Amino acid sequence: MIIGIDVGGTHTDGVLLGINSPNGEGYEILATSKVRTQKDNLMKSILEVLDVLLAAAQVPDIKRIVLSTTLAANVIVEENYDPVGLVLIPGPGLNPEHLLIGDENILLSGYINHRGIEVRDLEQEELLKGLERIKARGIKNLAIVSKFSTRNPGLEAEVLQLIREKDYPFENISLGHQLSGRLGFPRRLVTAYFNTAIMSVYRDFVQAVEKALEERELDTGVFVLKCDGGTVPLDRVMEAPIETVNSGPAASIMGTMAMTGVYQNKETAIALDIGGTTTDIGLFIKGEPAFMPEGIELNGFPTLVRGLYSLSLPLGGDSKIAVKDGKLKIGPERDGPAAAFGGPSPTPTDALLVLDYIQDDPDYEGRADLQAAREALVALAGDLDPTEYGRCWQDGKLDLTEFASFIIDKMLASIVETIQEILASLENKPVYTISELLAGVEIRPQLLLTMGGPASALSPLLAEKLGYREEVVPYAKVANAVGAALARPTLQTTVRVDTAASYLHIVEAGIHRQLKAGEDYDLEEVEELAMAWTRKRADDETAVVEISERESFNVIRGFRTIGKIMEVRAQIKPGLISRPEGSEN
């Protein structure tokens, strides 16, 4: 049996899947659970989900647990993450002014050239002054990024060593070279910045999961979904939490692929997961998820994190509705649950309840205080500019139904506009899916696939505005947890060969040795070695393996090439292990 859990900003969802075929390849959904996420007590939320699922299973039968979460993505979208100081070593030839995205920034004078040679050492006094400035502001998080650090991490390591020697009180530190082997200084510093910004959120998440599993004596393989739809063991997440920052949106996309016929029918479609805090937008092209091999974007900044194409709009069922300067504003903040459930602010969920769109939903029926929802909207309307919102008044009195309808129309318009902007941005550009590069392909979706709490209410309204067919994903309220559960277990192998130093590293296998006499490699052979070791470590010679990163450069001494340094990362290709019974074929 497999458990999938998605920890969202509003709800924590869970599913229990069991094998339903003699060959062990088919799965069925045995139990589901959905509870409110308690951000100040994540362990309790996870335990509540586990207890419902374990009521339908025996602990020894659980062979794998896969988690996803939108917690980190939400704090980035809401710009509610911890402040981060940036230590940048950009070298010459680059104006760094547009790169100063830290809450405090240090620009250092040392640099590494494109061959990996340290041309200029750091100036310690310059560094110490900058660190003191960051410390004085009470910033506890630091990202250290040097240009060409993948070819020589020495300057980044030197900064870290000084921080430790001087006992600076930084709690979370990221080094740029540890997060990706690919070049791209601007993308690397953004990656390191956000990696540091979400460390405390992820640490709380990992600790809550570990404690919950210990409480229920679950001793099994535990994984977290990555941005690319692959998985990483829970105990390795903190090495690079940025790799899982979009695990929530990835789970939604994998769940859509698992529970609908989009892949089998080779449909071009928009996938929506309308949550309480955000709406996650994904894209399928001819049945396959769109992919960003160069790196996803976070708040408009490009990173080096490979991932499924998605965009998180800070707009959900529990987004705070407010009036500013007489104008209605929805999100990006979320104050808590809807007013109908005791929350402090009106939300789109309150508007849906007033319109009777979700009154019969089992998750709301009997629990929602409709009067509280109405009162919250009425109180809000008093601050509106009547000249701009005239449709909401009849004979000088507020038409509450019309006002609630206006709120939902505004929410839908934001989602539709974002979808249209996404499609416009991809016009006349090469687009990748998880399998191939597509050039000259027109992206004209005709299908809208929705999941999330209000999916059944909003899907037909959105489809009408877009001119698409629409389909609510089966098990829409927990389909993201299904996507996490059914994600193919992946592992990766990093092989680094330094022919100048005559050394071979197969990192995850723990092999670090001198090259043997006559042993030599070119880049293609290093790739073959990485793929072979990935299959060996997975104990599956038929596993589909892909190269996720490759890097090769000459080692120069005395104006002469004396060897090469090559680094390759291979991984089992992300995908689904099965499609569950009850999905659309």
What are these regions (language model features)?
Residues 1-585:
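N-terminally biased helix-coil "hinge/interface" segments that flank
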